Amino acid sequence: MNFLTRRSFLKASAVATAATAFSARSWAQVPGANGDIRVAVVGLNGRGRAHLGSLTRLSGVRVVALCDADRDVLARAKANFGKDAAQIKTYVDLRELLAAPDIDAVSIATPNHLHALQAIWACEAGKDVYVEKPVSHNVWEGRQLVSAAAKYKRVVQCGTQIRSGEGLQEAVAWVKAGHLGKITAARGFCYKRRDSIGKVDGPQPIPASVNYDLWCGPAPMAELRRKRLHYDWHWVHVTGNGDVGNQGIHQMDVARWFLGEAGLPRRTLSVGGRLGYVDDGDTPNTQVVIHDYASAPLIFEVRGLPAKPGATGTDAMDKYRGVSVGNVIDCEGGSVVTSNYFTATASDKAGKVVKEFKGTDRHMQNFIDVMRSRKTADLYGPILEGHVSSALCHLGNISHVLGRGLSPEVLRERVKGNAPLAEASGRMVEHLGKNGVDLTRPPLVYGVPLTLAPKGETFTGEFAKDAAPLLTRPYRAPYVVKAIVA
């Protein structure tokens, strides 16, 4: 997939007729017949631009409205429609957009802390929804979104587009058919460079173009304590979920998909921290999360630091069996490796390739097709699957937040009884050593071991009382997610 930089987008937006990837021509609408599905895109930075690119290429679909709490971002997005711009309605407040009768669906690409609330609002307004991953900022609100989709009979697709590729669909079915024996471990990797976001001395100004009340939504309307309002919200717990819930949810979802596990694990444990620099972020940039499923362990790794200081190009990031961002599914008779979104390679125990799987991205088209058919069982990324995989990310972060720092020696002793965690955390410590990280300031955080109840998405055991409040959040009125009974 092509991810364009913010700089290139702003440059293109300055001159609407420029011959660039974000020229007016690229967002000209594909002609359709009567009965076009009318879509509004909500959140127009980053993934929102990708949504626009996908939607405007689909026949029988028209983007009719745009919404963003930042008026400058909104204006630039509208300008990119060129001659079609006059037909595009714009909104700063999503609630006004949802009151419009001439919109069939909304495509949500706002910050994580807004996803569930906005998707629930859309369901209540009778709109179908495509919502970016993670579908929630916490476990509880994700479950309310699942209930809202059922109660209001809406089509709700999660932005886990890897599930739409024929190649991965075939690979999952092939493994489940037993061609490599039972799965022994499902691994996901997010080795993706993340630089420091800087450290400020005091409150920063909110851009004049931003309606900060709407931007904050359910989160506290607090002073901005980082350089950038946009994007860097990922690295602050109050609005984001770190890379485990940003890039990582894709690979977390694929690992669970291969395992065939429909619900949450029996136990979850995290080891990690924000290491290598001191900045205004508070989410881990280095992390191992292990989910103890009955079938096999799901092991997930995040690394935001390079393979070694100064590393660039293809050698910039560590690789596990050739994978920086992807999955390794270990089985009794071999393994399946995915190193991009839509292809996979199966090998036997000797490393000989026995089968390859290739596919393409059909995710947005699938959403539109199901909107027309109303057969929600045909969704590739149904909201329930999106909720469960998002919850896996949240559980890892809950374990981390409640944990405490340990020296490498004590950590090694603590994890030695858990072979998969000991192996992964050992490699993590080695990686940090190559980056010159002093693991005494700050130390790695050994998270609390969380035990999940068999049903109900609640905790049991020693740390249940401390962990339970983190399944949800305090909501700022009027941006409150309420309990929904399907």
Task: Label each region the model flagged.
Residues M1-V131, W140-V155:
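N-terminal glycine-/serine-/threonine-rich beta1-alpha1-beta2 phosphate-ribose binding loop
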Residues L10, L52, A75-K78, R95-L98, ...:
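Non-transmembrane alpha-helical segments in soluble domains
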Residues V73, A109-H113, S136-W140, G159-I162, ...:
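Alpha-helix capping and helix-loop boundary segments enriched in small/acidic/polar residues
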Residues L44, S164, F357-D361:
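Generic alpha-helical segment signature
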Residues E170, K182, R187-G188, S196-G242, ...:
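Contiguous beta-strand/loop segments that form the cofactor/metal-binding neighborhood of enzyme cores
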Residues V39-V42, V63-C67, S107-I108, Y130-V131, ...:
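Structural recognition of the beta-strand scaffold that forms the well-ordered cores
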Residues D128, S136-C216:
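A contiguous active-site-proximal alpha/beta segment in oxidoreductase catalytic domains
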Residues G48-H51, D70-V73, Q118, E141, ...:
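Stable alpha-helical elements in mature extracytoplasmic
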